[in-house]
Amino acid sequence: MSFLPSSSFTAAALPENEGHKFSIMLWTLPKSLTFEQQLELASAAGFNGVEVGREYEKWTPEDWKRNLAKLHALGLEVDSAVPGRNALADHSKRTALRDDLMNAIPGAKELGCKQFIYTAFTRVPEQTPEQQRAAIVDTLKYAADLLEKDGIEIVLEPIDLLEHKQEAVTSVTEAFEITREVASPRIKVLYDFYHEQRQAGNLIEKLDKNIAKVGLVHIADVPGRHQPGTGEVNYGNIYRKLGELHYDRYICMEFSPIGDPVTVLKAARLEAISAMQSVQK
């Protein structure tokens, strides 16, 4: 299955993005839009990339041809994908994890996607916290080995307990500790400021101390998961810190826009650029 050369997907930061890279998690866009329309919206808002779930696993050959052509025409990159959900602390799910990864890799390679998003998902009730941590570390080492030859990373995303009461990893503090134990360049942390604010707060200090382990950041305000400025998180300060730290990976907008999506997403992108550039001049 190959419709376009992989070299087509080398999207760099757009000139108007001042060297920064921005993406949109597609599930946050109106459900009435087709995949192609979602891509057009992302491009119209000035974004470099998009993040997908598992929708590409259901594409027909004709879907692949059409969607890859649209990505190529718009110069968009698929920066991350979500290959599945398995309890990383549960060794009985190891085969399911392997199957998810093996099934996801061909499509990810076709899309030029180099990063998978995983949550630790559900706790194993009979495990102690120490056993749970050890099991997650072991599973991520296993996953890193599986992905080595394909050059794909995993970013571990903590989920707050308000969203998922049985979540095994709920804070970036623990996620950073886990990735250090895994000690693989293939395993990093997805710092989702929305989840971390709901769970623990203290967003900037943890970012400052652990920037080398951050593989991706997600943006949404609290409460409501809407655009920055609608809630309590001071994203201006967060963006300035990202600028000070010379963060050069994707900044993904994972919020439900209030208002016209293109207008709102463009404004969010420009706000981030302005704040980061203010400390880099």
Task: Pin down the residues of each PLM region.
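Active-site acidic/histidine proton-transfer and metal-coordination neighborhood
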Residues: 12-17, 72-74, 87-188, 279-280
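Active-site-proximal loop/turn and secondary-structure-junction residues that shape catalytic pockets
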Residues: 28-30, 54-56, 84-87, 122-124, ...
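N-terminal substrate-binding region of glycoside hydrolase catalytic domains
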Residues: 41-61, 82-86
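Residue-level detector of anion-binding/catalytic polar loops
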Residues: 48-49, 77, 114, 153, ...
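Conserved beta-strand positions in the central sheet of alpha/beta enzyme cores
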Residues: 51, 80-82, 117, 155, ...
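Metal-dependent catalytic neighborhoods of phosphoester/phosphodiester hydrolases
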Residues: 61-67, 92-95, 128-130, 261-265
